[in-house]
């Protein structure tokens, strides 16, 4: 006899165990995939090797231009992203990926040097406090697979405010679109195909907009500024689709003239 409960379920190999910690903007929250190997009561969506039980949304089929085309109807794709042979969301190329990879060699201490308050502010999106993990995820050296599922879904979990991963994915993409629009960019370039590279692209653009307002001119802080500056357009008006509106509300840096980070150069 067929179990009627299985008619509306899907086999799941590994289940995402969620630990919510509300301290530090949920930055201590985490996802750990554990062996499951049985039918789950919900349908399952797959993104970047990560199985996601659909607790809040339904399973959507077919290929659409954007992730929003699914969740606007209360759905998530059956599978999508760069790891898919045939993604349900249209593949997309992203800007500033070389910059993200170049910045992956710095840790948060490097970005926290004196004279870099605007750079640090730029890194405070999307998690609410400075974080540079996205550069490692977007690095050329980062290979997504079963071994990276916990890290990737933990990042998505921290971007949202839900206990359900499917809902956190929707919240993450909505946050991406909101920031892209704020920076004068088009939704079509941030369609949810690769959430992490979209986040990396936007963080890089925030850094490009923020860096001119900082004053650090020596040591590791100067190295950070040099990398960022190397990706700034000489004439941003010629690359509006990439550089947006250059919007930034600066934090004015007050550096002591005897401090090693104080500037007496034209950098």
Curated annotation (Swiss-Prot):
Family: Belongs to the phlebovirus NS-S protein family.
Stated name of the protein: Non-structural protein NS-S
Pfam family, one: NSs
InterPro entries: NSs-like (IPR039434), RVFV_non-structural (IPR024376)
């Amino acid at each position: 006899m067929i179990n009627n409960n299985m008619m509306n379920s899907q086999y799941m190999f590994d289940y995402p165990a969620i630990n919510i910690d509300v301290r530090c903007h949920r930055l201590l929250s985490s996802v750990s995939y554990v062996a499951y190997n049985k039918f789950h009561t919900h349908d399952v969506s797959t993104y970047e090797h990560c199985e996601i039980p659909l607790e809040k949304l339904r399973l959507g089929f077919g290929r659409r231009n954007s992730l929003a085309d699914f969740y606007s109807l209360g759905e998530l794709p059956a599978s999508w992203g760069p790891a898919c042979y045939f993604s349900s969301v249209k593949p997309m190329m992203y800007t500033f990926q070389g910059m993200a990879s170049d910045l992956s060699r710095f840790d948060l201490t490097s970005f926290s040097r004196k004279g870099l308050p605007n750079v640090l502010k730029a890194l405070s999106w999307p998690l609410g406090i400075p974080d540079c993990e996205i550069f490692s995820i977007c690095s050329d050296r980062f290979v997504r697979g079963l071994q990276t599922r916990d890290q990737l879904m933990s990042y998505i979990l921290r971007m949202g405010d839900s206990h359900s991963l499917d809902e956190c994915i929707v919240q993450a993409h909505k946050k991406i679109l909101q920031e892209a629009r704020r920076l004068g960019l088009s939704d079509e370039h941030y369609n949810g195909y690769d959430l992490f590279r979209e986040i990396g692209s936007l963080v890089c653009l925030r850094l490009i907009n923020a860096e001119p307002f900082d004053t650090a001119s020596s040591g590791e802080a100067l190295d950070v500024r040099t990398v960022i500056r190397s990706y700034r357009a000489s004439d941003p008006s010629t690359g509006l689709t990439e550089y947006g509106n250059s919007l930034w509300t600066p934090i004015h840096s007050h550096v002591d003239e005897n401090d090693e980070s104080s500037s007496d150069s034209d950098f």
